[in-house]
Amino acid sequence: MTQNFEMADRFTPSAVEQALYKHWEESGYFKPSEDTSKPSYSIAIPPPNVTGSLHMGHAFQQTLMDILIRFNRMEGHNTLWQTGTDHAGIATQMVVERKIAAEEGKTRHDYGREAFIDKIWDWKAYSGGTISQQMRRLGNSIDWERERFTMDEGLSDAVKEVFVRLHEEGLIYRGKRLVNWDPKLHTAISDLEVENKESKGSLWHFRYPLANGAKTADGKDYLVVATTRPETMLGDTAVAVHPEDERYQSLIGKTVVLPLANREIPIIADDYVDREFGTGVVKITPAHDFNDYEVGKRHQLPMVNVMTLNADIRAEAEIIGSDGKILESYTALIPTKYQGMERFAARKQIVADFEELGLLDEIKPHDLKVPYGDRGGVPIEPMLTDQWYVSVKPLAEVAVKAVEDGEIQFVPKQYENLYFSWMRDIQDWCISRQLWWGHRIPAWYDEQGNVYVARDEAEVRAKHNLPADLALKQDEDVLDTWFSSGLWTFSTLGWPKQTPDLKMFHSTDVLITGFDIIFFWVARMIMFTMHFVKDENGKPQVPFKTVYVTGLIRDEQGQKMSKSKGNVIDPLDMIDGIDLESLLEKRTGNMMQPQLAEKIAKATIKAFPEGIAEHGTDALRFTLTALATNGRDINWDMKRLEGYRNFCNKLWNASRFVLTNDKLDLSEGSVEYSVADRWIQSEFNRTVEAFRNALAQFRFDLCATALYEFTWNQFCDWYLELTKPVLVNGSVAQKRGASQTLINVLEKLLRLTHPVMPFITEEIWHKVKAFAGVSGDTIMLQAFPQFEQSALDYQAEAEINWMKEVIVAVRNIRAESNIPPSKGLDLLLRNLSEADQNALENNRTLIQAMAKLDAIRVLEAGEDAPLSVAKLVNNAELLVPMAGFINKEAELARLNKEIEKYQGEIQRIENKLANEAFVAKAPPAVIEKERAKMAEYAEGLNKLKQQYLAIEAL
């Protein structure tokens, strides 16, 4: 008996979450087990950038990771969730540059390199602390003593080791090649950092005079060249036509005179040219266009760089051969008038000069995509610069084979094709960046320009026998952030040392990440890991066995979340709530585009007129889990969040009903389990099976569905109600059976739900465990429920499902006839099968209590029923006498609706059976089943029509 047990009326997340998490962390529950005989399970978190704070995408992916970690911990595995943060070179440097500009009016150059880097370390301490606190608030079960940062000493050593080894193997080299150059930030940037923006531009058609008296097929002494970038024409080193374009075949190998620069350049043939674009003649500028660069390499054209690193026109062209070395034998003068001009000013001047010379043929409007640096915010410039590169083709071959052979699985599988498409056409990777924040490239130069690569300067001098007085200067550049991120799964475990952790937890089991970084991070992790980490047999290790690819979290209108749109949702605001004023300040304060503030404020007030209420971490986690459909983008849904907050309350209230019920009897003695007790155990087992199967397939949404369906619809709405009459009127043995089942199923349900909703389940479990006779300090170290085939009870399921349909049918008759629950009804039954008859006899008392019936009677064969409202449950006819209750008009309308429904089903089956293709292909058993269904509907329709006629005659 539990008369003295107390439990709060409602669950208040803010009252328990942070205290519970502190207890978990201090108790060391998140740490891997020291029992190395246990199977290991590990996940390396995609390290968030230390640029600010976590967003909803982080919360989404981390919730899914934590579900897997908590599940495997409860399965008895030795679990490690390796966490940490990424230094995020360019992004973090820009954040701090903006900060000191806004607060101090200074630039990084005012500080100097060392002092500015100290400022970034200060920022990292602040931002990294914010991120780790947010992750705690999400309930992430992380061993915080293992938290790493991509510029930790150990990880920095790993970066140097990889660089030096790859250089020694000839896979890292320095060369002059074309890169995405940000002329504002003065650094090379990756393709990921380039945003192609739709733009209304122009297609200029210029006349390039043919040299040496050559003529076109139609007698012209010039070629018309179409270009969208006139400012680069001073760097042209050829014009190209398609080899099969008959208009120009006779000119291939001849030359044109490059206007303004007055030098001859060849006419070449290349398949790259689109005969339908413009005039079918294009200028080739290998130093200023990626496609032209490839054409130039194929034809061994010189590369004429006419721009400075500021994207101004140079005073003197830089001329590079196709081998990447300075070319002394080629001359390309830049006219004085363009020298020093900003690139777009030069564009206008060049167009004007072509027009003045009579060489501007026409200008056509042209829609094009202009590449912008996503952080600098200006058009990027393809630029020839000296950079460090990784020759990745040898690494890529092994990485492709790992996925082909199934060593690494992508979920959903379609993302394998994305991976293959990039990896099979992979280009050398530019790994150097002209920044101050990041891993400094471990290369040193003497005054003659000789390059020495080693782990540190002392090693350089020892390795090359350099005298102590020889001046050496370290390379100023830093490595691309993705270089160090690519080592994440093994560098965090102590590599290059062969540590016990590396042996125990590598390869990791799963990577959960977004599709947008498959190329830039996932692929590079696979390449680096398989090159550097081998098992005891020398076989390359994969970094992870599965890559689970998520979609993006978008706002409720399907828009991508961004600060400029003012639609970013902070996961902590969903957890703790936030008033409207604070939300407006968060969304419109310190904006880079303050002109958008008013628009954002209006949209925010419309979406959240009262601010955001507290929902708690569990409701947020359950919402994210329920929305996690495979691979698709997800529209955030506040109504779902509110619904799952109600779900938390439902679980709390159900637990409170069970634990504070003064009729609960857990005393020793004989026990009798009812059909309902057996049914709920069976249903619970099916839920365990559904959850486990869904999780094995990364169908997190189906895990949430299984939990919700069982908890709300089966346990709360049905089983609790079915136990109430037993606890009041049952025998002592029946009361014990119901009481034990309530406690047993509730305790197991808490364990089943724990990986998704850790806080509320821990809180309730501590109240339940004494009743359940369970010991332990925390639910997270309890065993996860197993599916038990023997606990399935088909008879109990069939009986309770029939009983539920009967109760629902009676309740529907009440609702449709406006009969209040306080008025007792009689129920007459006809045409019962033997199974129906047994279900009735076994559950008569429960049916009467649940449906609020005065009496239940089975009609004798041939016995006429009084005027009644009828419902069908399978073939059984349910009749509720309506004397004194019936609303004739409403009942006829209801029957008419039922008749139409049955007629529709009959018509649907008739159409199917009339379809010759269906009949020809369907197995005979399927056709027979359809005919049987149609006969059932016909019989039911006949009964409904009789009922209709009887009521109509009143």
From Swiss-Prot:
GO CC entries: cytosol
Reported EC number(s) for this entry are: 6.1.1.9
Main localisation: cytoplasm
Give the location of motif 'HIGH' region in residue numbers. 48-58
The entry's keywords = Aminoacyl-tRNA synthetase, ATP-binding, Coiled coil, Cytoplasm, Ligase, Nucleotide-binding, Protein biosynthesis
Q: Name one GO biological process term.
A: valyl-tRNA aminoacylation
* Reactions performed catalytically: tRNA(Val) + L-valine + ATP = L-valyl-tRNA(Val) + AMP + diphosphate
Enumerate the NCBIfam families for this protein: PRK05729.1 (NF004349), valS (TIGR00422)
The annotated subunit structure for this chain is: Monomer.
Summary of the function given for this chain in its UniProt record: Catalyzes the attachment of valine to tRNA(Val). As ValRS can inadvertently accommodate and process structurally similar amino acids such as threonine, to avoid such errors, it has a 'posttransfer' editing activity that hydrolyzes mischarged Thr-tRNA(Val) in a tRNA-dependent manner.
Q: What is this protein called?
A: Valine--tRNA ligase
